[in-house]
A protein has these predicted regions:
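Class A GPCR helix-loop hinge within the 7TM core
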Residues: 111-146
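Intracellular effector-coupling site of seven-transmembrane GPCRs
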Residues: 215-256
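Membrane-proximal N-terminal segments immediately preceding the first transmembrane helix
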Residues: 5-25, 87, 94, 126-130, ...
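Extracellular TM2-ECL1-early TM3 structural module of rhodopsin-like
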Residues: 29-34, 63-65, 69, 73-121
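Loop architecture of class A 7-transmembrane GPCRs
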Residues: 140, 158-201
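Extracellular N-terminal segment of 7TM GPCRs
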Residues: 1-49
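Juxtamembrane membrane-interface segments at transmembrane-helix boundaries in membrane proteins
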Residues: 16-34, 97-106, 177-194, 231-234, ...
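Seventh transmembrane helix
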Residues: 243, 249-256, 270-300
Length: 300
């Protein structure tokens, strides 16, 4: 009788077993994720507090507007980080599946928003360096704020519903009291192709901008030699280099790994979570630019 019950439990997927609700992350991975996200939260909160001074700078500057949008992206992401820390610590998700989708999707939205803003800032500064663009600020503050709001109005209504609609649609991904297990959706050919295209695009753009930055710095060093450090433009390019380095250390590794992860989501899921958590370290950018005053970050 006992043997028949055991066999029935194994063969009938409707019978709840401990294996159905077993955590998908081992303790070393959970500890790593808790440490990373805790550090991200502390650094992010500190950076946001310090970057408030940015509001006192020239709000019409294109670069300042880009930084303000970067702050908003970090802020929205940081709101969801405590939920991740709690889940990895308790291994239990007690909130709704919809909230799970929001928290899980936000880290991806953060990655793409931060990359987009980085790319815009670097492109603007490259164009300014090569004197391809003279207009660097709006004529009125209201126009600047309107342009900033337009970016979010256009992106969020498209990006958020698309991501939330795709997350967790597969029944195989749904686990009671568990979250962040949406790997099955990648088996959809369209989702797989979209992820591959996005990863390759981000890697390619990052490499191109790294190359351009290296060329600019090399040209300035050859032109001014040891006097380079006395040139204001040189320090602007150094700040650009920091953006590039953050992209190369936080965003590119995740997307390089993702090219492999997309072909083996089950086995590589824990490692993918760690690489995804590392993207949150982009919040460090706010601390980087608050040394001698935020005003020095932006050229006008």
């Amino acid at each position: 009788m006992t043997m028949n019950t055991t066999v029935a439990n194994i063969t009938n997927p409707a019978v709840p077993t401990s294996s159905l609700h077993s955590p998908h992350l081992t303790e070393p991975f959970r500890i790593t994720l808790i440490v990373i996200y805790t550090f991200v939260l502390l650094v992010g909160i500190t950076g946001l507090t310090l970057m408030i001074s940015l509001l006192k700078t020239n709000i019409r500057s294109l670069t300042t507007i880009a930084f303000l949008n970067l702050m908003v992206a970090h802020f929205l992401f940081l709101l969801t980080v405590p939920f991740r820390i709690y889940y990895y610590a308790t291994q239990t998700w007690n909130l709704s599946s919809g909230m799970c989708k929001v928290v899980s999707a936000m880290v991806h939205i953060h990655v793409y928003m931060v990359f987009t803003i980085y790319a815009i800032i670097l492109t603007l500064r490259f164009l300014h360096y090569y004197k391809k663009m003279q207009w660097t600020e709006f004529y009125r503050r209201l126009h600047a704020l309107g342009a900033s709001a337009l970016v979010w109005i256009l992106l969020l209504p498209i990006m958020v519903p698309l991501v939330l609609n795709q997350y967790g649609n597969s029944d195989d991904d749904a686990k009671e009291n568990q979250c962040f297990k949406f790997g099955k959706m990648i088996e959809n050919p369209a989702v797989y192709a979209l992820n591959m295209i996005l990863s390759i695009f981000i890697i390619s753009v990052s490499c191109v901008q790294t190359g351009i930055q290296a060329i600019i710095l090399h040209a300035m060093i050859r032109k001014y030699g040891q006097a380079s450090r006395s040139q204001q433009e040189f320090w602007v390019q150094i700040k650009n280099l920091i953006f590039v380095l953050i992209m190369l250390t936080c965003l590119v590794p995740y997307h390089l790994f993702r090219l492999k992860y997309l072909n083996d989501t089950v086995k590589l899921s824990p490692a993918n979570e760690v690489f995804l958590a590392i993207t949150g370290l982009t919040c460090f950018d706010m601390l980087t630019f608050t040394g001698r005053g935020v005003c020095q970050v932006c050229w006008t």
